[in-house]
């Protein structure tokens, strides 16, 4: 199972992306505090969103508190020497303000409080599984035109 839940602040204005077929995307960074209780370290986590989720996040201002539900994905970076490296990011499926009753798409149906992990069942129907873990088509990253005007800012913040 690949599910990620983040709670934190939007660290900078999201970067807009657009695929060749016109799908809106956005990359941004979430400032999250370590909740283990051992230290107060901050992590700056790279997040990507697509479609309605991206439309929601590009309208947000830095510093706003957000709850992100998504999954870990990898992406490839080719440097100037034509060498490939890979990195992890979170791909957001849902984003909402913790104090509001609606998400970027619809009324909240699965929050941490009523998630399938809190009330486990011996078996679930296919419809229940699909609602808890919606399937999304894989994105063809070769057809994306990135606009990374804030990536330097992301690198500077993550060096803390």
From Swiss-Prot:
Organism the protein comes from: Mycoplasma genitalium (strain ATCC 33530 / DSM 19775 / NCTC 10195 / G37) (Mycoplasmoides genitalium)
Coiled coil: none
Source organism, top-level taxon: Bacteria
Gene: ssb
Keywords: DNA-binding
PROSITE patterns, sorted: SSB
Domain SSB: 1-99
Protein known as: Single-stranded DNA-binding protein
GO molecular function ontology, one term from the record: single-stranded DNA binding
